[in-house]
Amino acid sequence: MKRQKRDRFQRAYVHGYKAGMTGRSRDDCPSQDINLREYWMSGWREGRGDQWAGMTGISGIHKNPMVLS
C-alpha cells in the first residue's frame, strides 16, 4: 500500500489549524459538511490562539499538529 487512508476529521483539523496560524478568516472553511466544519473550526480556533500567543515559526513547532502525528 503506497499510503494509508487518512482520517478526514484529522485532516480538517490540521487544515483549520494552518488557516488560523496564517490569519485567514473562519469564513474560509471549505466544507459544507457540519461534522467536518466542526473539526475545521476547532483547528482554526487553536491555530488562531497560538498565533495570538506568538507561537509562530520555531517557537510554535511543538504545537504544530503535523509534527505531533
From Swiss-Prot:
One of its GO terms (cellular component) is cytoplasm. Keywords: Cytoplasm, Translation regulation. It is found in: Cytoplasm. GO terms for biological process: regulation of translation. It comes from the Bacteria. InterPro entries: Ribosome_modulation_factor, RMF_sf. Disulfide bonds: none annotated. During stationary phase, converts 70S ribosomes to an inactive dimeric form (100S ribosomes). Belongs to the ribosome modulation factor family. NCBIfam families: PRK14563.1, Rmf_CrpP_fam. This is Ribosome modulation factor. It comes from Chromohalobacter salexigens (strain ATCC BAA-138 / DSM 3043 / CIP 106854 / NCIMB 13768 / 1H11). The lineage of its organism: Bacteria, Pseudomonadati, Pseudomonadota, Gammaproteobacteria, Oceanospirillales.
